[in-house]
Amino acid sequence: GISLSTNQINYCKEKAKKLGLENQVKFELIDYRLVKGNYDRIVSVGFGEHLGVKFYNTFFKKINSILNENGNFLFHLIGVVDKPSAPNQFINKYIFPGGVCPSLSQLIKPIEKTGLIVADTETLIRHYDKTLEAWLERFLAKRNEIKDLFDEKFCKMWEFYLASCAAAFRYRDLVVFQLQ
């Protein structure tokens, strides 16, 4: 796996070691544009929202250049089912600056432009609201401990973020896309 987050890389390495998998997996702190080699399988989960639409051409071109001829690429991200629109102002300001939840039309064109073939598209419209509700429950159960690490303002923002996203998924304003 690759990431620009030292915390993510360290967490993954520790988890792999606990599971006895440290010799079977590799985690690297690197920008995706610098990845070398050829791969049979590439999976991207939760990165497309942070990448931003303006960098999709670069990203998919890179994927195409390192994916073997008969390889498989899975792109999993949160999106919108409506027409392309501006990012949510609250989330863009306080949670994920520069982030965007794209429409399917914003994804397909740059994928096809790079020569990748969209073989399967799935829109997951059930259950993610329940995931966010579970995260909110866990957050609320540990709220005092989290407040000690951050502050009350952060706790209120995070609580609002999780609750509003759960509602957005429940009412189909947000969905999860999986493209292969």
Language-model segments: which ranges?
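A short His-aromatic
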Residues: 34, 50-51
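Serine-hydrolase catalytic core recognition
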Residues: 56-59, 75-77, 83-84
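Residues lining the SAM
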Residues: 44-49
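A short acidic, Gly/Pro-enriched loop at the edge of an enzyme's catalytic core
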Residues: 30-43, 173
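Class I SAM-dependent methyltransferase SAM/SAH-binding core
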Residues: 1-34
